[in-house]
């Protein structure tokens, strides 16, 4: 869906669903706005809302209302305009643990109404306490909480990666992923980390973020100009991450119609002398050059030219 700049009120709500092989129902929710336009609301709206709320607290922003403030419109539409932002962030963060976050959102609201427990939304403490302990029934016939879901997903993630990067392939990347998994288990598990970040003010917020970066780092950070740096802890080698980025560039090149190398902006900034006309016409042939760029080196090493 397109972004919608203005705050158009919600007039009504429509939903439909289909059933997948496991028997689970996948819902699609449509907001009918007062100008009679329709907007498909989904998990993206929840993710963008959380990012928007944290960002606007510390920096100037200019975001379209939908999807960045869709959640505010939903709370207003349901008659909960009094609910504090920190509660809203906590609420949607919880819903994102479910594979059907929008459906979970409406189900919990209905649950609170039926059980006369709407007061749960009055404060962050009451909301977070209720949700952290609230189980939901997974389609596999077992109860799930955000703790069990996180632990299960981390285990599945680790297993998947061990199959993808078996043996000695990308050992630094494997070691870093294990660091992130261990950090998530000890520091992020069973808490609403984004809601907690949102509640932090000024220096405390930046201290927390810097703490995360010092503990686990960020493999590669790229800006719109193609500049790239690494914020990894000192005992990790960023070169493996660059190699993986180059593999991704190759996948983008062979799967699309664009003749440009996906790394050309990066090379133009970091090492402009290594670029030439082949980068925008036939980057595979870069493997024949005397001075090799990252893409050409990958092609040559694997004999793909």
Give the ranges of each region predicted by the language model.
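Metalloprotease/metallohydrolase-associated module, dominated by Zn2+-dependent proteases
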Residues: 1-63
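Non-catalytic terminal regions of proteins
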Residues: 6, 66-305
């Amino acid at each position: 869906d397109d972004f919608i700049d203005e705050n158009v009120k919600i007039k009504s709500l429509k939903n439909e669903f289909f059933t997948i092989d496991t028997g689970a129902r996948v819902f699609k929710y449509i907001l009918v706005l007062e100008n009679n336009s329709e907007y498909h609301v989904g998990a993206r709206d929840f993710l963008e809302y959380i990012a928007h709320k944290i960002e606007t607290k510390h920096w100037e922003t200019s975001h379209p209302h939908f999807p960045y403030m869709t959640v505010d419109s939903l709370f207003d539409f349901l008659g909960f305009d009094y609910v504090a932002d920190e509660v809203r962030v906590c609420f949607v963060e919880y819903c994102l643990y479910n594979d059907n976050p929008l459906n979970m959102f409406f189900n919990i609201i209905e649950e609170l109404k039926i059980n006369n427990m709407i007061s749960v939304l009055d404060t962050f403490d009451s909301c977070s306490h209720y949700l952290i302990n609230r189980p939901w029934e997974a389609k596999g016939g077992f109860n799930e909480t955000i703790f069990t879901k996180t632990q299960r997903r981390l285990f599945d993630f680790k297993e998947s990666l061990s199959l993808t990067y078996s043996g000695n392939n990308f050992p630094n990347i494997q070691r870093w992923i294990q660091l992130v998994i261990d950090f998530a288990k000890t520091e992020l598990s069973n808490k609403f980390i984004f809601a907690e970040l949102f509640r932090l003010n000024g220096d405390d917020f930046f201290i927390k973020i810097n703490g995360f970066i010092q503990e686990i780092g960020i493999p590669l950070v790229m800006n719109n100009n193609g500049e790239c740096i690494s914020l990894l802890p000192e005992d990790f080698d960023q070169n493996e991450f660059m190699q993986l980025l180059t593999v991704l560039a190759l996948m983008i090149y062979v799967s699309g119609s664009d003749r440009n190398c996906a790394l050309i902006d990066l090379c133009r900034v970091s090492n402009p002398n290594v670029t030439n006309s082949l980068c925008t016409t036939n980057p595979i042939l870069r493997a024949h050059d005397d001075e090799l760029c990252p893409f050409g080196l990958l092609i040559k090493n694997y004999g793909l030219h």
